[in-house]
Amino acid sequence: MPKVSVRKSIVIDAPLEKVYEFVRNFKEWPAWSPWLITDPECKVSYADDGGQYTWEGDVVVAGEMSILSEEKPNEIVYQLTFLKPFKSQAGVAMNFALKGGGIEVAWSMDSKLPFFLFFMRPMMTAIIGMDYERGLRMLKELLETGSAGSKLEFPGEEAMPAQDYVGLRSAASIAEMGEAMEYDMKKLHDWVAANEVELAGTPFTIYHQWNPTKATTEYTLGFPLGKPLDSLPDGFVAGERPACRAFPIKHTGSYCHLGNAWSSGINRARNKVFRQSKTIAPFEIYENSSA
């Protein structure tokens, strides 16, 4: 059977014992779990001895996590069982070690896919890896500041009007996307300010391509226009974001946690909470700042 192995890590500025005990306590997981944050209505229950928790929801479906063994304060070994959409198991571990004045938390998983899903191995490895990275970032912020720094709201479907825009189309690795976006934002802002361009709202980004396996994306950062422009400098693009029915997901928090909103949307589309358009690219709107 095709094997799937994932390992991601992060360094947290907190005492080793505090980090270990926090992670070991399943009742703390809803605050930093990369899956539970996407499904606020998910039902979670805990074993009396603290060694297991179970969940069931419309988005994250159903499963359970049990502690198999632990070596305090350096390692916790779990068994992860998915009950739906089909039953499967995975071995999971959390390892804790001193590193550079902080604590390195390494989150790993080893599992096997059914043979008929062998072609999904690269995709599953990439997606689970990104999930682990999202969770570790929230865990770090939670332990260092007291808040995970990410909140999701689901206001329901709404009509989005068509919008003219001026923008920059770019390609970047997901790891370098923050820097690329910051560069594009400054370039657009400086040009708009220098030319006294009339804007009609806050910036947004349209995602034309997103490749989890290669960890790359192609996007257009756009500034909404009050009226179309007659001419543009080299490298700039103009277009119209088409009118559509949208399923908005509101994220409040740092840009580094925005993947929580995207994961929530992808999972809802997969579970038929809404029907995703095949012709209109998904987009994100920055209501205040993209920082």
Spans of model-derived segments:
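Short, surface-exposed charged micro-motifs
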Residues: 9, 64-66, 93-95
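A solvent-exposed interaction/effector surface
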Residues: 60, 79-81, 86-291
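Glycine-rich portal/gate segments that line the openings of hydrophobic small-molecule binding cavities
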Residues: 13, 24-32, 38-86, 99, ...
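Hydrophobic ligand-binding cavity/cleft-lining segments
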Residues: 1-46, 158-161, 180-187
